[in-house]
Swiss-Prot record:
GO terms for molecular function: ATP binding; ATP-dependent protein folding chaperone; isomerase activity; unfolded protein binding. It is found in: Cytoplasm. GO terms for biological process: protein refolding. It catalyses: ATP + H2O + a folded polypeptide = ADP + phosphate + an unfolded polypeptide. SUPFAM superfamilies: GroEL apical domain-like, GroEL equatorial domain-like, GroEL-intermediate domain like. Forms a cylinder of 14 subunits composed of two heptameric rings stacked back-to-back. Interacts with the co-chaperonin GroES. PROSITE patterns: CHAPERONINS_CPN60 (PS00296). Belongs to the chaperonin (HSP60) family. Together with its co-chaperonin GroES, plays an essential role in assisting protein folding. The GroEL-GroES system forms a nano-cage that allows encapsulation of the non-native substrate proteins and provides a physical environment optimized to promote and accelerate protein folding. This is Chaperonin GroEL. It comes from Methylibium petroleiphilum (strain ATCC BAA-1232 / LMG 22953 / PM1). Its EC number is 5.6.1.7.
Length: 548
């Protein structure tokens, strides 16, 4: 086991604070409408240019082990805030730095760090309460666009495209971000339910231009096993042929003789059929088949519920207005399922989302809700170069998370104003002793920091602006983009409540841990081996002069 260095007291905290400052100073240059970019080296390819706080924080590793520990703890603040709220990473980092800086003064003056921590916790609970009181729900598309714009570093176009995506697929809908092919951002909306399985044979194609199979007003057969014997399918095919309508078959697999017969019948024009593999795997496949059954008003033909292929009637089949099957995707538009059944299914899946333990499961369940509830929107990000594309895509994803957070918990005035108003509304928070009072005081001082940094990055005098904003009331604040004062919400400068709340809670939590640190343990730096001279055994090389 490698030898360890143990550092105590003031020296340990001082080294940790150095690390905090290095990371926070690199991150905070990106804050506000006039924040600057940070360029990140890549081991191969072009460097990445970003204005996203968490991307900068994640890149930072310091050589000094103790400094690095401080930096990593603040990095944790940024990534936790990003995971929970999707945005506000720079605000969280700036708050953490300010709390540590103010707190270290009190610790150095001999105050009890544990009481300081208790004071910090009391102040945060009170401030969060005030933020919730200030919060107002997002109702209009305009507000959603404004939240997106602010989060995307004042890019209007991004805010608008996210708002129109939410308009089209609903606030619960799935919105994904992809690389675009042109210079401009584009929005594609897929209505109905889409899943990532295409036709099993290209002979099913009936729309050569789009290379897809389109079925109008089809029946939908859902089967949870393989179909390889055509005899099992014959009764269903005969009933569908009599009705004169097309048929979509979704099964675990359609193969061999069954697939060949379906293809031959389609080519001859006897029956219009398309066969598709069922989406998902294992239990998720069963759940998705059940979703499609509810959406189309049909049943999943499964032996465990006593249904077999031979006994299927038209009443067991689902129906839809239109189905489009491409090489890789199938879209069911306007299924015939009852609205009440679909709503009940959505509620059931939402309960599962709340109980889900892994992010992956939660994401998949949310996709299912969206597919049942409305549709899927794809934002295609356009840019001139790959470097710009990466930077823009990261901003669009941030903005999307921020708008989701705004829909979830509402909005407050942006530009650091909400925290100042929370401080004023909280009034006199009292601790149990003088040291706790100091902890409360340091938080109330530290929450001015986001506004100070926004103003500093815009090239103005921070103290003057903070005092002017504190003298105002309500949403009155400072618009750093053009140097004017006014109502932040009217000017469209909004922050999601969840983002501001999460940033404050995470920053205070980690900063309080740093203040209560008394010892640090890190691996001792390895001594470099002395450089060796030339290896021996090279003597006897004299007398090599040449007589000319």
């Amino acid at each position: 086991m490698a030898a360890k260095d143990v550092v105590f007291g003031g020296e340990a905290r001082a080294r940790m604070v150095e690390g905090v400052n290095i990371l926070a100073n690199a991150v905070k240059v990106t804050l506000g409408p006039k924040g600057r970019n940070v360029v990140l080296e890549r081991s191969f390819g072009a460097p990445t240019v970003t204005k996203d706080g968490v991307s900068v924080a994640k890149e930072i590793e310091l050589k000094d082990k103790l400094q690095n520990m401080g930096a990593q703890m603040v990095k944790e603040v940024a990534s936790k805030t990003s995971d929970n709220a999707g945005d506000g990473t720079t605000t969280a980092t700036v708050l953490a730095q300010a709390i540590v800086r103010e707190g270290m003064k009190y610790v150095a003056a001999g105050m009890n760090p544990m009481d300081l921590k208790r004071g910090i916790d009391k102040a945060v609970v009170s401030l969060v309460e005030q933020l919730k009181k200030q919060s107002k729900p997002t109702t209009t598309s305009k507000e959603i666009a404004q939240v997106g714009t602010i989060s995307a570093n004042s890019d209007d176009d991004v805010g608008q495209i996210i708002a129109s995506a939410m308009d089209k697929v609903g606030k619960e809908g799935v919105i994904t971000v992809e690389d675009g092919k042109s210079l401009n951002n584009e929005l594609d909306v897929v209505e109905g339910m889409q899943f990532d399985r295409g036709y099993l044979s290209p002979y099913f194609i009936n729309n050569p231009e789009k290379q897809s199979a389109v079925l109008d007003n089809p029946f939908v057969l859902l089967y949870d096993k393989k179909i390889s014997n055509i005899r099992d399918l014959l009764p269903t095919l005969e009933q569908v042929a009599k009705s004169g309508r097309p048929l979509l078959i979704i099964a675990e697999e359609v193969e061999g003789e069954a697939l060949a017969t379906l293809v031959v019948n389609t080519i001859r024009g006897i029956l219009k059929v398309v066969a598709v593999k069922a989406p998902g795997f294992g239990d998720r496949r069963k759940a998705m088949l059940e979703d499609i059954a509810i959406l189309t008003g049909g049943k999943v033909i499964a032996e465990e519920v006593g249904l077999t292929l031979e006994k299927v009637t038209l009443a067991d089949l689902g129906q839809a207005k239109r189905v489009e099957v491409g090489k890789e995707n199938t879209t069911i538009i306007d299924g015939a399922g009852a609205a009440g059944d679909i709503e009940a299914r959505v509620k059931q899946v939402r309960v599962q989302i709340e109980e889900a333990t892994s992010d992956y499961d939660r994401e998949k369940l949310q996709e299912r809700v969206a597919k049942l509830a409305g549709g899927v929107a794809v934002i295609k990000v356009g840019a001139a170069t790959e470097v710009e594309m990466k930077e823009k895509k990261a901003r669009v994803e941030d903005a999307l998370h921020a708008t989701r957070a705004a829909v979830e918990e509402g909005i407050v005035a942006g530009g650091g104003v909400a925290l100042l108003r929370a401080k004023q509304a909280a009034g006199a928070i009292k601790g149990d002793n003088a040291d706790q009072d100091a902890g409360i005081k340091l938080i109330l001082r530290a929450i001015e920091e986001p506004l100070r940094i926004i103003v500093t990055n815009a090239g103005d005098e921070a103290s003057v602006v903070v005092n002017a904003v504190l003298a105002g009331k309500g949403n009155y604040g400072y618009n750093a983009a053009n140097g004017t004062y006014g109502d932040m919400i009217e000017m469209g400068i909004l922050d999601p409540t969840k983002v501001t709340r999460t940033a404050l809670q995470n920053a205070a939590s980690v900063a309080a841990l740093m203040l209560t640190t008394e010892a640090m343990v890190a691996e001792s730096p390895k001594d470099d081996a002395p450089a060796g001279g030339m290896p021996g055994g090279m003597g006897g090389m004299g007398g090599m002069g040449m007589d000319m």
